[in-house]
Amino acid sequence: MEITVTLVPINLRGAEEPERNQRFRLKPLCAAAEVCLAVKCRSPFAKFKVLISVTNFDNKHLQATVCSRHAAVCVVNAPGQREVVFDGFAKPDDEGATVPLVVGPLFAARQAGRCVRAAVDAIQRQQTVLKVFINEAYLQSAWGAVRGLFFSDNNHESDLTSNVGKFISVDPTDVGARGANSSKWVPAINYVTGRQLLTILFIFKFI
């Protein structure tokens, strides 16, 4: 399995500058990893759009749950697709669209929420954390879908929900004002969460 994190610079006019992308590739060797990414910034006002791609996996379907301190989203690869792609969190008023995750030195303070001490600490450390849970995913049968309306005995999903809840510890921020990505998404309602394969904590260190 290979994971690629791409940071797309956004200039002061709000336009993306893909020719200056910073790309990090890794092949996790253990089930739980912590990875520090040194992000080069030209100024304290630097901003980057985060893209995450998971490739080279053996499973037919894979579920990647990406969590910031204020939001989370699960992404499953479509049938025949050998890549799982994260390009942002679900847009509050349109589940078929995503809002980009933007990081940078000053955004680190925003993710600290309303806690003044946490905000000051975030500015001093100039870093942002992002956690990714990767699970197997299975296509749900018609009977399983009906049964799921009345019973819920999926321990893998319960564990994932609990882990996500522990990581998201800050009041949600309003992402509705940000522009949406051009990509279009379809809700994956017929998949079941399988066993957890990998957990990665990304630490974006702005230098």
Curated annotation (Swiss-Prot):
InterPro entries (alphabetical): AcMNPV_Da18 (IPR009661)
Keywords: Early protein
Described purpose of this protein according to its UniProt entry: This protein is required for viral late gene expression.
Protein name: Putative early 22.7 kDa protein
Organism, as annotated: Orgyia pseudotsugata multicapsid polyhedrosis virus
